[in-house]
From Swiss-Prot:
It comes from Neoponera goeldii (Ponerine ant). GO terms for biological process: defense response to bacterium; defense response to fungus; killing of cells of another organism. It is found in: Secreted. The keyword Transferase does not apply. Belongs to the ponericin-G family. The keyword Disulfide bond does not apply. Expressed by the venom gland. This is M-poneritoxin-Ng3f. Has activity against Gram-positive bacteria and S.cerevisiae. Has non-hemolytic activity. The modification Proline amide is found at residue 18. Keywords: Amidation, Antibiotic, Antimicrobial, Fungicide, Secreted. Its main location: secreted. GO terms for cellular component: extracellular region.
Amino acid sequence: GLVDVLGKVGGLIKKLLP
């Protein structure tokens, strides 16, 4: 769902930005 996509994007951003 949309929330799942947002969660994935948020996780990637957290990994890229320490």
